[in-house]
């Protein structure tokens, strides 16, 4: 399997408990990326494709249906809702789920490029998610050079950059106080 650059970035702990929205064109590998994360975290049963009637029926019967499938590990499992944007009131549905159990689960939401309507999510999902766009394979990924460095904490980054030997003396003086 080809390692994707976005994997390490999107699933970094630095994003906290917020939902991860993975968008992109058809066949870019969104579902594969999600399933890879679930497998890595021992959460394979926590994948739900909202095109399936049984998933929708379970949701109608119990809004938090996925909690019945919770694996014994990890302590905070990942759950993936693929194509949830195809149901009516999907934003309200996600908000209710996240607000109810967002401290006990990590959510990843996948959908096609049309899913970028999340930019208009407004108040219902404000502050509850980060969006990541998965592009088709990049040459470096095909060549096996997908590793990227997750950006450090902004404060640490600035301190490191400003105290670097090639940094102008004036900026170094600012750091000293």
Task: Label every model-predicted segment.
Residues 1-14:
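Pre-Walker A adenine-sensing motif
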Residues 22:
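Hydrophobic anchor at the beta1->P-loop junction of P-loop NTPases
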Residues 25:
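P-loop (Walker A) phosphate-binding loop of NTP-binding proteins
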Residues 30-31:
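Conserved lysine of the Walker
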Residues 45-78:
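Short glycine-rich substrate-engagement loop in P-loop NTPases that contacts/grips substrate
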Residues 72-90:
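Conserved P-loop NTPase "ATPase switch" module shared by AAA+ and STAND
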Residues 91-115, 122-123:
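Conserved catalytic/switch belt of AAA+ P-loop NTPases
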Residues 118-177:
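Interdomain motor-coupling "hinge/lid" segment immediately C-terminal to the ATP-binding subdomain
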């Amino acid at each position: 399997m080809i390692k994707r650059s976005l994997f390490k970035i999107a699933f970094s702990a630095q994003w906290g408990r917020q939902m991860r929205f993975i968008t992109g064109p058809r066949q870019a590998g969104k579902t594969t990326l999600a399933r890879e994360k679930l497998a890595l975290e021992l959460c394979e049963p926590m994948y739900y494709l909202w095109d399936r009637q049984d998933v929708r029926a379970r949701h109608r019967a119990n809004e938090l249906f996925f909690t019945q499938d919770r694996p014994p590990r990890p302590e905070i499992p990942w759950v993936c809702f693929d194509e949830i944007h195809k149901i009516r009131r999907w934003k309200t549905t996600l908000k209710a789920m996240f607000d109810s159990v967002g401290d006990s689960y990590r959510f990843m939401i996948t959908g096609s490029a049309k899913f970028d309507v999340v930019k208009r999510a407004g108040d219902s999902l404000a502050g509850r998610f980060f969006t990541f766009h998965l592009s088709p394979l990049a040459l470096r990924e095909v060549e096996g050079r997908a590793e990227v460095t997750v950006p450090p904490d902004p404060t640490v980054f600035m301190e490191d950059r400003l105290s670097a030997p090639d940094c102008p003396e004036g900026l170094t003086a600012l750091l000293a106080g």
